[in-house]
Amino acid sequence: PVAEVAQVPEERGIRQTISIDENGVIYLGARPMAPDRLTAAIRNALENDPRTKVYLRADARATHRHVQEVMRATAAAGLNNLIFATNQE
């Protein structure tokens, strides 16, 4: 996604980045990950540090269905604040 204004968070802390490529493949960091494994990985990260922030980047060609899969997986892990990452135009 692209935004007119992009803000870099001041508090970096522990962060996980989930990416969805144009084929709908989900990655946690650089590792491909099925939605059920994503839930377990995010749950584990939150148990280790509840302040963990999770960012979602999706290719412009990724479908809404794949974004919903990630949203469901992170919600099932107990995450209540998924941050959508954008690139400034």
Language-model regions, residue ranges each:
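Amphipathic alpha-helical interaction surfaces in cytosolic regulatory modules
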Residues: 60-85
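Short, surface-exposed acidic/glycine-rich loop or hinge patches that mediate macromolecular interfaces
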Residues: 32-33, 61
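Periplasmic peptidoglycan-binding/anchoring modules of Gram-negative envelope and division proteins
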Residues: 34-48
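Extracytoplasmic juxtamembrane/flexible linker immediately downstream
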Residues: 1-32, 50, 80-89
